[in-house]
Curated annotation (Swiss-Prot):
GO molecular function: glycine hydroxymethyltransferase activity; pyridoxal phosphate binding
Gene3D superfamilies per record: Aspartate Aminotransferase, domain 1, Type I PLP-dependent aspartate aminotransferase-like (Major domain)
Record note on quaternary structure: Homodimer.
Main location: cytoplasm
Gene: glyA2
Xref: PROSITE patterns: SHMT
Intracellular or extracellular location(s): Cytoplasm
Name assigned to this protein: Serine hydroxymethyltransferase 2
Cofactor (UniProt): pyridoxal 5'-phosphate
């Protein structure tokens, strides 16, 4: 019987050598990231070290279970990697329990619901239309189908959370779980008010801090952990790690339930290469310079929104306390779907986004969402974000004047974007 011999280059060939077709895709995406200004609030740019860990030999290792209690042998080194991630996360957020295994923020939220509520129970979260997230009980999501999901919103006058409505809904529906946090809410959330309401009706209180976790880690945003029974987050966005999820708590009983919900409840083997990359990112976030970065993210968001407002746009809620903002396009009689495409042709990446009380359909929208984490990672400061705000206004004014044939304004802005991106390169040598 002939023994198998790996084909030539199996252990040595690069992607370019082994798969030129895919290599072209990777090169094109690298160029896109290098040449476009990334303003999508949920995206960031990881360090070379995080990239290296995510592409490491740990991708080969199956490790069902938890450190010291695996269902496979050979887990000595991945145990160390996972423990590093856990201990660094505990240090970052000042908590006693962390699970770093969720593959995503949605998986982290799903694990909380599997652990703490039953199908048919009532949960309460911010509506998608008000800036919440799909996984907080939106009708199309699993959480909206499996649970009796009650949704609260924001006030018409200032687009801030309507705590009178939150209290009334909680008293009326007696939810088992109340959720704070969202994907398009730019203001600091009053966690103490939520805690008070949850205690009044006997509910557990969960905070999804996926968007602002990096600001919390830097000490520049109030931490939800003193108030919430359970906290979930992604590990990318402002935390600037690989794409993934995490669950945190100071309640050991809840921690045991979460561990069982993550594995074997929702997932099998954890992605050990991603957990290693999380450990690297958490180590970076523990450095003093990360606080400087996080402060710059906040300062840059204010500079960007000031420039957009000066250009005749409305900023939902009047501004931002965080890394993101919602821009109301109605003063220029534009819609988010058209603006997103025009800005992308100018090499500025945003996403169309509904605004509170939006009259447009979700596929159209009256707004766009912008964020500063990725641009700040490149090195953009307030001067650059002021310029970026002006470039956005230039594209939008062209759209308002010329309709969808906005090629002249897009070309002019694209040239200015190229100059800016060349000044702040990323991933040299890749």
């Amino acid at each position: 019987m002939t023994a198998y011999t790996p084909w030539t280059g199996f252990f040595s060939a690069s992607v370019a050598q082994a798969d030129p077709e895919l290599d072209r895709v990777l090169r094109a995406e690298l160029s896109r990231q290098q040449d476009q200004i990334e303003l999508i609030a949920s995206e960031n740019i990881v360090s070379r070290a995080v990239l290296e860990a995510a592409g490491s030999v740990l991708t080969n290792k199956y490790a069902e279970g938890y450190p010291g209690k695996r269902y496979y042998g050979g887990c000595e080194e991945v145990d160390v990697a996972e423990e590093l991630a856990i201990e660094r996360a505990k240090a970052l957020f000042g908590c006693s329990y962390v699970n770093v295994q969720p593959h995503s923020g949605a998986q982290a939220n799903g694990a909380v619901m599997m652990a703490l509520v039953k199908p048919g129970d009532t949960i309460m979260g911010m509506s998608l239309a008000a800036g919440g997230h799909l996984t907080h009980g939106a009708p199309p999501a699993q959480s909206g189908k499996w649970f009796n999901a009650v949704q609260y919103g924001v006030r018409l006058q200032d687009a801030s959370i309507d705590f009178d409505e939150v209290a009334t809904l909680a008293e009326t529906h007696k939810p088992k779980l109340i959720i704070a946090g969202g994907s398009a809410y730019p203001r600091i959330i009053d966690f103490a008010k939520f805690r008070e309401i949850a205690d009044r009706v006997g509910a557990l209180f969960m905070v999804d801090m996926a968007h602002f976790a990096g600001l919390v880690a830097a000490g520049l945003h109030p931490s939800p952990l003193p108030y919430a029974d359970i906290v979930t987050t992604t590990t990318h966005k402002t935390l600037r790690g690989p794409r993934g999820g995490m669950v945190l708590s100071n309640n050991p009983d809840i921690g045991k339930k979460i561990n069982s919900a993550v594995f074997p409840g929702l997932q099998g083997g954890p992605l050990m290469h991603i957990i290693a990359a999380k450990a690297v990112a958490f180590g970076e976030a523990l450095r003093p310079e990360f606080k400087v970065y996080a402060q710059a993210v906040i300062d840059n968001a204010k500079a960007l929104t000031d420039a957009l407002a000066a250009g005749g746009l409305n900023i939902v809620s009047g501004g931002t306390d965080t890394h993101l903002a919602l821009v109301d396009l109605r003063p220029k009689a534009l819609t988010g779907n058209i603006v997103e495409k025009s800005l992308e042709r100018a090499n500025i990446t945003t996403n169309k986004n509904g605004i509170p009380f939006d009259p447009e359909k979700p596929a159209i929208t009256s707004g766009i969402r912008v964020g500063t984490p990725a641009g700040t990672t490149r090195g953009f400061g307030t001067a650059e974000f002021t310029e970026i705000g002006k470039l956005i206004v230039e594209v939008l004014d062209g759209l308002a004047a010329n309709g969808e044939d906005n090629s002249q304004a897009e070309a002019a802005v694209r040239e200015k974007v190229a100059v800016l991106c060349r000044r702040f390169p990323i991933y040299g040598g890749l």
